[in-house]
């Protein structure tokens, strides 16, 4: 992730939900819950995003049992680094905002 690059809110919540392995529907539910309903992912949108995140090496699809139709995904170490940088960036934004508001 290049310095100064911000994740979209959807990508942020998808990555955050994949700290623990989840299948697509679980990702949609967790994302909606964590965002207090602000981020609602349609299946097509989610699977397009998952494909792109796999290509970047930020997440990986886990092996599935032969009879399972559910695909599970999990954050990679690279994805964890991206997520940590984004959390740090968001903290800095909030701290700067609070500082300016306090100073009036």
Kindly give the residue locations of the regions a language model identified.
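Basic amphipathic alpha-helical segments that dock to polyanions
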Residues: 46-47, 53
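Intrinsically disordered, low-complexity serine/threonine- and proline-rich regulatory segments
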Residues: 1-6, 86, 90
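N-terminal helix-turn-helix DNA-binding core of bacterial DNA-binding proteins
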Residues: 2-45
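Amphipathic alpha-helical dimerization/coiled-coil segments
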Residues: 84-104
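Beta-hairpin "wing" of winged helix-turn-helix
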Residues: 54-69, 74
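A cross-family signal for key residues in well-ordered alpha-helices
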Residues: 16, 29, 51, 84, ...
